[in-house]
Amino acid sequence: MGPENPLVSLSAYTTQLQEHLPPVDTIDATAKAKNGATGTISISFGTTLSGSELTVACQDGVVSVTHGKISIGNKTEEIQDERSGVPPEVRAWGEALAAGKANERQSPEEALADLELIEASLRSGEQGGKPIVLQYQTW
């Protein structure tokens, strides 16, 4: 969303689908940006679905990333799929360390913004979907 249009609130429902993953293994949330745009966030480690999917629909088109492919409009390309964000994050951290320069995308502020989304989702879910005001989404 960016610094000029940060997320400002989030409302979520949470549940535990798998007995061995307490207390919560699934989050379904709706987030609202400063300009009023809304979007959904769905994260589950308890579902039977395999893989991950990311879709962003905007005024000028749609971008989808799923199973090693990225689609922008009608054009689809293969991309490197490492099954999680961990290897690229560690690689970027190592490159920044070797260069002696911090990676802005791995700043404490970025981490705080990510943590805030997860914590707000859990708190909202505990309160039956009550909207939570977000404070740390501007970076």
Language-model features, listed with the residues they occupy:
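Short polybasic amphipathic segments
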Residues: 54, 68-75
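A generic structural motif
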Residues: 32-34, 57, 73
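C-terminal helix-rich "cap/oligomerization" subdomain common to oxidoreductases
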Residues: 34, 96-139
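Short acidic/polar mixed-charge low-complexity motifs
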Residues: 6, 35-37, 61-62, 75, ...
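Active-site loop of classical SDR/Rossmann-like NAD(P)-dependent oxidoreductases
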Residues: 80-91, 106, 113
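Rossmann-like dinucleotide-binding domain that binds NAD(P)(H)
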Residues: 1-38, 44-49, 109
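C-terminal substrate-binding/catalytic lobe of Rossmann-fold NAD(P)-dependent oxidoreductases
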Residues: 49-51, 57-60, 64-67, 88-90
